[in-house]
UniProtKB/Swiss-Prot annotation:
GIY-YIG domain mapped to chain residues: 1-75
Family label: Belongs to the UPF0213 family.
This protein's name: UPF0213 protein CPE1444
Top-level taxon of the source organism: Bacteria
Signal peptide: none
């Protein structure tokens, strides 16, 4: 499974990425081993994700989302919000 995800950083900025292991990747971001952008901006919080069968689709979607404005990303997040109590169970955080 491949995932595209959006994180909200401690400074309220948004980070978009893709991975094939969402649980491991979020832990890496929170441990300072993720993307340079999220280092020093943690802890991060998962606010949105989608899953895809193949890497190419996930990377294409990530590219699309990264080009959105902040307001468009916030609309995307609110249209498919994650219930906090459920997403932690879904990805074992």
């Amino acid at each position: 499974m491949n995932y595209v995800y959006i994180l909200k950083c401690k400074d309220e900025s948004l980070y978009t990425g893709w991975t094939n292991n969402l649980e491991k990747r979020i832990k890496a971001h929170n441990n300072g081993c993720g993307a340079k952008y999220t280092r020093g901006r943690g802890p991060v919080k998962l606010v949105y994700f989608e899953f895809f069968e193949n890497k190419r689709e996930a990377q294409s979607r990530e590219y699309y989302i990264k080009k959105l404005t902040r307001n468009q990303k916030l609309q995307l997040i609110s249209s498919k919000s994650i219930k906090e109590e459920n997403y932690e169970k879904e990805i074992n955080l």
